[in-house]
Amino acid sequence: MTALEQIRLSLKHSEINAFPHEILYIGVAGFEDRALGFLKSALDQGKKFQSCVAIEYQPFDPSNRKAEFADSATRVFGDIQWRTYNRFSPEDFTQSLHEIMDLSRSVSRVVVDVSAMSKMLVVVLLHGLRELNLPLSIIYAPAEIYHPPKDDYEKAKAKLSDASPYFLTTDVYKVVTTTTLSSIAMQGAPLVMIAFPNFNHLEIAALLNETNAQKLFLVESVARPKQDAWRLDAIRWINRGLKTYVTPTCYQTDASDLNANIELLESIYNDWHLTHKIALSPTGGKLQAVTTFCLKNMHPDIHIVYPVVRKFAKDYTEGCLAHSEISLQNFRDYVTKLDQYRKRRLSEIKQIIERAGQKAVGKIW
C-alpha cells in the first residue's frame, strides 16, 4: 500500500439513525438552509442527542438564522454550548477549540457539520481537533440550488463587458491566517499560491496582492451534474483578469472527490516545495477545505491563508440535499497518518532509487 493510499478518505451517504445518542455535534448558525439541515432531519426522525456546540458568526449579520437554529437545537440536544467565530480574526477561536476538546471527553463521537461553515473555519476547527482521541464524522450536505443562476450571470456579463461582475459576496476585507496554520518555512523564497477559483475574482486577486506570489495554480471544479457545466466557463471568464498579476496554471478536478483533490495538491507541492514557499487557500468547496486541512498536516511547511469578504449576498444557496459523511474511527490516529506521510513517502522514494541502482548494476555485469 502506497503512502497516499494509507490516507485515503471515503465519502458515503450518512444515516442520522446510525449516530449514537452520546455525540457532540458541531454546527454553525449560518444563513443557508443547510445550516439547519441536520437539525431538521433529527426532528423529522425523532432523534435526540447529548450535546451541541453551536457556532455564531461575527461580525453580526442579520441574515444568519441563530433564532431558528437555537429553537431546533433545544428540541434535539440535551446540552447546547454557544461559541463565537469572528471571520475577520480566526485566531480568536483558539480558546473555543480548547473548550470543545474538554466537552468531547463526555461523548463517544464528534460530528462536525461543514455544510454551512466558513471554509476557513473548517480548516481552523479540524486543525484544532488534531488530538481528538475519538471517532469523528465530518458530514456535508450540498445545496439544492447554487447561485447565481445562468440567466443572472448572462445578464450581468452583458452589462459589464469590460469589468468582471462578482456574485455571492461583496468586496474582500482582508487576508487572514492563524498562528498554527501559518508557516515561516522558506522565508525569502519565491511563493507559489494554490487556490480554487469561484464567482468572486476579488478573492484570489486579494491573495496575489497580499502575498506577491510568483506562481499561481488554480484548481477548477468540474461541474456535476452536467447541466451546471456552464459554471466552469463562467468562473474562468470572471477570473480572466488574474493574468494581469501572474499567468495561472489551471487543473480540473471534481470538488467532491476528496482523494483526487489530495493527490492533485500533493503533486503541485512535490513539484515546487524545494524551491518555493507554498501557500494554499481554501477558496473552493467545503470538502476542498477538508483536503486543505489534510495537506497542511501532511506538510506543515504549507502556509494557509484566506481572503475574508465583508458580507455575503442575499442569494447564495437554496435548499439542502442529503448528507454525506467522512467517518474516521479515531481522528488522532488519522492525523498521525497524515503527519507520517512524509516519512513513508521518503521511504518509497528511497526504495525506488535502490531498485533502480540494483538494475543498473545488473546491466553493467
What are these regions (language model features)?
Residues 1-109, 120-365:
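Long, low-complexity, Lys/Arg-enriched
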